[in-house]
UniProtKB/Swiss-Prot annotation:
NCBIfam families: PhnW-AepZ, PRK13479.1, transamin_PhnW. Its cofactor is pyridoxal 5'-phosphate. It holds the Pfam family Aminotran_5. It is an enzyme of class 2 (transferase). Transmembrane segments: none annotated. Disulfide bonds: none annotated. GO terms for molecular function: 2-aminoethylphosphonate-pyruvate transaminase activity. The gene is phnW. Homodimer. This is 2-aminoethylphosphonate--pyruvate transaminase. One of its GO terms (biological process) is organic phosphonate catabolic process.
Amino acid sequence: MGEPYLLTPGPLTTAFSVKDAMLRDWGSWDGDFRGMTAELRRELLAIAGDESGQYDCVPMQGSGSFSVEAMLGSFIPRDGKVLVLMNGAYGQRIAQTLKYLGRAHVSIDKGDYMPPRGSEVAAALDADPAITHVVVVHCETSSGILNPLKEISEAVYSRGRKLLVDSMSAFGAVPAGVGDFRYEAIVSSANKCIEGVPGFGFVIARKSELEAAKDRSHSLSLDVHAQWAYMNKTGQWRFTPPTHVVAAFLEALRLHRKEGGVAGRGARYANNRDVMVAGMRQLGFETLLGDEWLSPIIVTFFSPAHPNFKFERFYELMKARGFIIYPGKLTVVDSFRIGCIGQMDSHVMQKVVAAAAESLAKMRVDTATPPALALAERARLAA
C-alpha cells in the first residue's frame, strides 16, 4: 500500500516533489544556499503580508518548540511579566518554558474545551498593571481549538501591552498576517501548514522588537537577535543549517503559492475536516468541540464507551489500513485526534472514515457513542 498517510498536525504527509528536493546536497556557506535562505525569508514575509517592511523573518534550527522558546527568551525582558492564555498542552508548555527562563507569569486556564475570550484578557490586564506581554497559542492542537486571535489582540493593545503568538499549526492555512491582527512576533515551523519537513522553525517579528532583543536571550543558540543580525550581515545561519530541509521547504512554498496561498490551503483543509467529521459522526463518534470552535487543522474525538474499544488496538487497525492517527492529550476523558492537514484531499478523508468503520467492526464495536460522562463534561464546561 506504500507509506501511510500521517493524520497528525505535523510532521505530516508531504508531496513527492518536496521529498525529491532533498536528494541534492548543499554547502551551507555557498552563495546558492545563501540565496535559498534569503528566498525563504522573503516568501514567509509575503505570506505574513508585511507590505510596510516593519517586520523581518528569522529562521531558527530545531523543532517548533525551539522557536517558541527563542521568541520568549528574546522578546520578553527579564523584568517583564507574562499572561499566558492556556486551553491545552501547548499553552501549558509555554508556561513551563517561562518557568525555565525565570520570567514572571500568570495564566488564564480554560481547560480542554473552551477558548480564552477578549473580555477575559481585558479583565486580567486591568487587574494586573505589571503584565507586559500576553502569549497565546493560535491553534491549540491538543484539542483542536482555533483561538479568537483578533479579539484577544484588540484587548491586549487597547491596554498598551504586547502580544506574542505561537502559530505553529495555523500559519499558512489560517489568516495570521500582520494585517489580520496585531502582534509583535509570531512563530511557526517548516513541517506544519506549509507542508515541508521537520528541521527548522521561524520567527516573524517587528524589526523594532528584534533590535531591542540584543543581549537579552538566555541562550547562545536560541538568540533571535543574534541570528537575525548575523543573517543580515552574512546571509548565513550562525550554526549548521538543515540544508536539505530548506531545499524541501522552498518546494513546499512553491506548492503553497500554486494552491492559492493561505486561502487556498485553508479551504482544502476545511473541506477535509468537514468530510471527515460528517463521516465519523455517522459512525457515532462525537467531537470534543462544538462546530464553531473546530479548527481546519486537527479534530479531537471522544473515545467510544463500548467495552471492546481499546485505542491501542484501534490505532494498529487504522495503521494497517494506511492511516496514522494521534492519541489524545485531554486531561479529563479518553480521546484521540485526526489531523486534516498535509497532502490529502476529501477523497482521502472518505477513506479514513471507511477505515474507521472497518476497524470498529474488527473490534466488534457496534457503536462509537462516547460515555455519558464525556458528553456531560463537555456540556458543563461549554455552558
